[in-house]
């Protein structure tokens, strides 16, 4: 039934504890540490394909102090003493499965799972069944080559009919994308929201907010609650 022993919050907190200990006692770090693993090993059921640009995961922030420290890192990177005028593109995190959609000449030709971040599973045929994913884009400003990245998920209201098979919507989305028969995947009400990109040969956008707007114009669904916010404390 794909039932995890820990919920996401418990897992994230344990991972944070491990990262803290490794930072303090570096000799504790091992190759199997969560700090060195992104996602999961690709399944043997599907063909493995390397991402043209690594598909990394996001770090967690558990409280306001974590956010302030994040902004301090930005200041240090930019060699700034202090500032609360940075603009942040923010949107709620969708609890689903990350996917990378490869487009060439406007045509969706391949879809990959995150896998371990470097190498993903070729789940193209299953992704083809999702209505939210455009299969052909004719916009003149659409790049010749681009990897559109986003989240595959199941809405809570649609999960009601799947409770007997899966522990939660995220596991349902994951299991559905790993079906051997795409017709079985098609029966599941999967959704897709785009939010970033991997490889792109050429694209003219100034910032993340502009990119999200461009995605909408190309026909991709984006998070309706995304906002541009000034200052980390206004998040």
Task: For the regions a language model picked out, list residue spans one by one.
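RNA/tRNA-interacting regions in translation and RNA-turnover enzymes
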Residues: 1-235
């Amino acid at each position: 039934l794909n039932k995890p022993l820990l919920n996401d919050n418990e897992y994230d907190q344990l991972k944070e504890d491990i990262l803290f200990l490794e930072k303090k006692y570096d000799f504790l770090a091992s190759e199997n540490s969560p700090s060195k693993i992104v996602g999961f090993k690709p399944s043997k059921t599907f063909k493995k394909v390397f991402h043209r640009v690594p598909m990394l995961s996001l770090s967690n922030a558990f409280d306001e102090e974590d956010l302030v420290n994040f902004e301090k890192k930005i200041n240090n990177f930019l060699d700034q003493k202090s500032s609360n005028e940075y603009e942040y593109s923010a949107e709620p995190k969708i609890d689903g499965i990350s996917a990378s959609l490869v487009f060439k000449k406007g045509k969706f030709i391949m879809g990959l799972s995150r896998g371990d971040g470097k190498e993903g599973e070729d789940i193209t045929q299953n992704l083809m069944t999702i209505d939210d994913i455009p299969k052909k884009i004719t916009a003149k400003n659409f790049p010749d080559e681009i990897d559109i990245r986003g989240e595959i998920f199941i809405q809570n209201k649609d999960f009601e009919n799947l409770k007997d098979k899966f522990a939660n919507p995220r596991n349902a989305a994951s299991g559905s994308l790993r079906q051997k028969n795409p017709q079985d995947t098609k029966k599941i009400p999967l959704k897709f929201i785009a939010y970033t990109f991997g490889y792109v040969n050429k694209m003219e956008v100034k910032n993340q907010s502009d990119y999200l707007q461009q995605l909408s114009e190309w026909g991709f669904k984006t998070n309706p609650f995304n906002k541009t916010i000034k200052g980390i404390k206004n998040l």
